[in-house]
């Protein structure tokens, strides 16, 4: 069996001001997306991508669950409930498996933004997914969300977030 080697890129410092309202963050994202499409691809980075996923997740939750959530810590228990419901829908094949990957990206972006806004840290990418770096510790948000969506109830978001706050 081949040895596995974890490869993590350098930590990217967060450049987005998460103290802004959701409307302001949405406008910022749309403005930057236009600049990128208009010939400034250097503006695209992992943090920008995660913000886009996070904003998409807000829209998904509003449409599917008729629930408003935001980037505050108070949304963490709600996120656990949403992920549990989505997990059940995936496991019972009410949601096609290919949609699970899209949901995982969006939920990961959402949780990453909550972390950056309320705890701090930077963005990381690796050969096992995206994550955050807090005080030198890498936390793989994408994998945590993925395991929870696949039915691993030990991978709840609340305990993960509380552990990150201790770093």
Can you annotate each of these PLM segments?
Residues 2, 69, 121, 138-140, ...:
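Short non-domain terminal segments
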Residues 22, 32-33, 57, 114, ...:
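Generic alpha-helical secondary structure signal
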Residues 83-86, 114, 118-119, 148-149, ...:
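Generic structural signal for hydrophobic core residues of well-folded globular domains
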Residues 63, 106, 144-148:
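Arginine residue identity/basic-tract feature
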Residues 1-101:
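The feature captures two recurrent sequence modes
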Residues 19, 29-30, 54, 124, ...:
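Compositionally biased, intrinsically disordered low-complexity regions enriched in proline and serine
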